[in-house]
Amino acid sequence: MSIEKLAASRILRPVRSMNKGSNERWFEYCRTTCPICGKQGWCMVNDSETKIICGRISSETVFGEAGYLHIVAEDQKRGYDFSQDQMIKEHRKKNDYTLDIIYTLFLESLDMRDEHIKMLRGSKRRITREVINVRNYKSFPIKPWDTTKELIKKVGGKTSYIVGIPGFYAKETKDGRYFTFAGRRDSLLIPQRNIYNQICGFQYRIDDPEYMTVVKNHKPSFKAEVIEQPNTIEVTYKINGKIESIFKDKVDVKEWYEINYEGEKLGEVQLKLESKYIWISSGGRFHGTGVGNPLPIHVAVPSRELKNWERGELIKKDNVWISEGSLKSDIAAENLDELLTNEEKLMYGTTVVSIPGVKVWRILIEPLKKMGVKQATFALDMDMITNSDVQRSLLECAQTLYQEGISINYASWDINLGKGLDDLLLNDYIPAIGKVR
């Protein structure tokens, strides 16, 4: 099996060692569910399947910024294949200074296609051409291998400069290998800026998300794939040493289907729409690099401020907003600057710090301390606030930030006025602010 097919077929995604100097490998539950919380994404299992790091269900042991450590019971083991032929050589992510240089050179070779300009300037987002240029949004390249080749020429023809940069990897062909950039051609690249205005990653927004399969409670060698969009799937299983097709049909979205063979349950499969916003990563690909260790935060400021923010300059703010989604945070920062009074700007600020998910709130601590933040206002999408996992994470975050001398507010509003802070502000409303005590 080629490296590309191996990466695409995985239900577990390899991540780097969680401990320096350790040979223990960890794998993220990508297209299968975590046995602890029953959800996909964020959670990880080690290569002996004896430990799980769950990002949602707490335990007595906090495992760094990743989540909580759980010991795997025998009946929770699923018998995944962790053999060496499942491993792919990837590289440790380079520092933010280097990422910024390479990503900036990469963006210089890209342009904006009409469909993305129309999407950003439309009534739903109302982003001007000037702001599009200032924020350096770009369309994903149609021929990423050519763009990567051009970048390699810019850095003196040395591929070593792009190794260790998430997104870049070596593609395997019958004629050899060449470097290219991972992602979807039908997407918009959204730069992630750190507290020094360095581009340290990208999210990409997919124009037309496709359906994908998720499996749970399954036996080894149980696999499910979408063979025809939107909803025709095929399930395969190894029987007497041979991979056999045991189910092929159209299925309903979000329904769990139990798959049996000769009276024995083999697993369950669900069809769901892939996320519209995805991190640029080449983890699990040959000479690729994962986006984590650590995951990037994104610091969104109004475009008038971004124009004058020098690269490498530490941003200092007394007050910030905390939200999710980099594009949404860019829009929120722009509209906070327009809608808030001068007094409100002094009280709450117009800087929005975007995190990859509320469960990874720990990655906020050091950046907020370096920024000199005294007060943070959480403004998560209103449909998330009733989620018990979100509530627990917010409480833990508030307690930790309070211990660091940072007071916490929460923003709330009628969901009928907009799901997210960006939607609310675009409808010319501002949220109610409450203090967490």
Residue locations for each model-derived region?
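Residue-level marker of positions within ordered structural domains that often coincide
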Residues: 39, 59, 125-126, 195, ...
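TOPRIM fold recognition
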Residues: 1-13, 32-35, 43, 53, ...
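Non-catalytic accessory segments of DNA primases and related replication-initiation nucleases
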Residues: 1-187, 209-234, 242, 248-252, ...
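Short, charged/polar, Gly/Pro-enriched secondary-structure boundary elements
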Residues: 60-64, 199, 429-430
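Short capping/connector residues at structural and topological boundaries
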Residues: 145, 300, 426-429
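Phosphate-handling DNA/RNA-contact segment within nucleic-acid enzymes
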Residues: 151-371
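Glycine-rich, histidine-containing beta strand-loop boundary motifs that form or position
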Residues: 46-47, 203, 380
